[in-house]
Amino acid sequence: MLDLKTAVIQFKNENKMPILITIVFFFIIFYVSFFHNLTFGEPSGIFYYIAGEEILKGNAENLGIAGAPIGGPLLHVTLGNLLGDAFTAGKIISLISGTGIVFLSYFITKNLFDKKVALLTQLFFAVSAKIAFLSIMVLNEIAPLFFIFVALYFITKKQKTIPDFLLIGFFLAISFWLRYQSVIILIAFLIFLLIFERKTILKFKQSLLTFFPFVLTISPILLFNFITFGKLSTNAPNLYIAAGFKFQTEQWHEKIEGIVNEGLISAFFIDPNLFLKNYFYNLFFHNPDHLFKFTVDVFDTLSIIPVFPILGMIPVFGGFLYITKVRLTKLQFFIMISALLIFFLLILVFGEIEYHFMILVLTPFVVLGLSNIKKIPDNVKFLLLLTVIFMVVISIIPVYRAYLLLPIWLIFPALSSLFFIEGIPVIQTKIRQLIQREGTKNET
């Protein structure tokens, strides 16, 4: 009871702006969604409802839901039947999930930085075209993303208790019921614990506390998939590979079409060189293009400055340099130059500058980050590690929509907000000091 009273007092003293932003977002999206967007604009919404009906009828073995388990169809058909309107049900799911993400974005960022940075980050979420789009449309994308964000709130807490680890596994599993991508967040978190948790006993204890609730919660889906389809996952990456790989030959495409229901290893061994060429193109150009907008003609982007190419990278990397508190040493400079030279030569020999320039952009930041890793807060460290692991895994396929990268997006507006609020004033101060110093020298 005392804890509840303390929580109420804390809420009263808390800044009301995050709640106000969330409420404004809710009513704007509600108005657009229910008064202007009055038909299924995407086939996915009605597809998941119909798929849910077929599952309830016992016809699941005849369904082909590539890239998604049965949770999405069951959610849509259950709420749709309850309300008597599949369209309204889908709208409610999207609206509540999108509003929840905007609300949580503040509190997750507050786990990382101060309230001002968290508030600006929340504003980036509230005005994001992708968040608004997913909150209005009837799709199966934003509900699993909401549960990922709930898990991220507990993951980024500075002090975690046993219930926190249990809840992380549980909410990632709920997301897994709707989309498989949450397993990447789980893998990243387990790797983070094993690398950065100092006490060996805690490493395994915390990992098991997260892993077991996840496995226990997803076990009905795995069992259903195995009984119905003869495999644990209904994911079909080869389908996306056949449709999306940039570099293809006619013979290769025909072979891929023949193995769309098989695993990635089969696709890899058809032509390893062609597979790797596409993989590194996805990893260093196509997928990051949806994060930062490399070219003028790309409109499907998560860049916080979507009008101009590349510019969205500047505040992100500026925020990263701010948290690492970089003081470049001669050794770091030597390693950086050497790495840049080696990668440049490798790109000239094996790659193309047009598609692999991001390696050269990232190299200095990787060197500085690893050299100053102790200065980076652990929860920020996790989000950076998650970004790397997510991109490495997801780049097996070319993402066809920018919103597929939203599970890792929070760190980008958060670092940008940090740069705008704390980094720029530091730069201004240093410029003033430099001008004053030069003025003093001229006077003498």
Q: Predicted segments — roles?
A:
Residues 66, 70-74, 83-100, 134, ...:
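Loop-to-helix entry region of an early transmembrane alpha helix in multi-pass inner-membrane enzymes
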